[in-house]
Amino acid sequence: MSVVSYRCAAIGLACLLVTPASAQLLARKDLSAAIAADIAQTAMATCSANGYRVSATVVGRNGEVLVQIRGDGTPPHTMENSFKKAFTARTFRIPSGEMEERLKKNPQMGAQYLTGFTTARGALPIMVGEDVVGAAGVSGAPGGEKDEACVKAAIDKVADQLK
């Protein structure tokens, strides 16, 4: 083959690699306001049934607040704390309480310096298959494991809608 033939073949190959298919929009699922509200209200109702006054926050896939509810009689810090828990669970794709162990194993990861970060237990990521579409966090129960149990009950309630 001549040099011109190689150049033409290279240009043709380059044109094939840059096709409109690589410029398509992303297809993704996001939490609806209705599902987010259901998760927050169910988490609060579950905790309330156990005698805990809590606040709940549900964040979307980008960490933005979708729903935040302060429970009757809860201290003001529970709003911020429920957000930090949810934001941490969304950002790192794990239950918020697992961050403490991660930091012990890798203190140089720097997560502790992020705004909105916490190691407190009480939030879970909301998954659609392997995709994290958000997270829910609760604060106010006497112990993060109780907060987390309320979140789990709420996510379990809407699990059939997360497909």
Q: Where do the protein language model's features map onto the residues?
A:
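Bacterial N-terminal signal peptides
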Residues: 8-20
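N-terminal secretory signal peptides that target proteins for export/translocation
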Residues: 1-6
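Flexible, solvent-exposed loop/hinge segments and secondary-structure transition points
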Residues: 23-163
